[in-house]
Regions:
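N-terminal low-structure segments adjacent to metalloprotease catalytic domains
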Residues: 1-3, 47, 59, 66, ...
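Short pre-active-site segment immediately N-terminal to the catalytic Zn-binding motif
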Residues: 52-71, 85
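Catalytic zinc-binding patch centered on the HExxH motif and its immediate surroundings
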Residues: 33-55
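Generic detection of long, well-ordered alpha-helical segments
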Residues: 1-10, 87, 91
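Zn2+-dependent metallopeptidase catalytic core
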Residues: 4-30
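Short, surface-exposed acidic
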Residues: 24-33, 107-112
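Post-HExxH zinc-binding segment in Zn-dependent metallohydrolases
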Residues: 83-112
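Active-site recognition of the HExxH zinc-binding catalytic motif
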Residues: 69-81
């Protein structure tokens, strides 16, 4: 699948509109910076705060489900930042939110 900024922004908007993510009160897509990452960065996706930025490597996502799972992963990092937790770690807070979202979406939590 071809992934561009418009697609990444649309996936983010769709995800934060779901009931499980809507309750987190995250900012709309227009308040987030989105970027396409080169494959040389050796990551699927990233989140950095101040300003909120989500980056995605198009070459590492062949299917929409992969992009959705990566976006959920980065949204969890963002949520941790907004709630005063470490956005860098996959700690207890990260794991609890990941499980809640995975259960709601019908995903294997280890794939998020």
């Amino acid at each position: 699948m071809k992934i561009d900024i418009k697609t990444v922004k649309a996936v983010y908007s769709m995800l934060i509109a779901t009931s499980v993510l809507r309750e987190l009160g995250l900012p709309p897509a227009d308040e987030i910076e989105f970027e396409l990452l080169p494959v040389s960065d050796k990551v699927m996706a990233t989140y950095t705060p101040d300003p909120d930025t989500i980056g995605v490597c198009p070459e590492r996502h062949r299917f929409l489900t992969s992009l959705i799972k990566s976006m959920v992963h980065e949204i969890i990092h963002m949520a941790n930042h907004y709630y005063g937790k470490s956005y860098l770690r996959h700690d207890k807070n990260f794991e609890q939110l990941r499980k809640k979202i995975a259960d709601e979406f019908g995903f294997d939590e280890n794939e998020i």
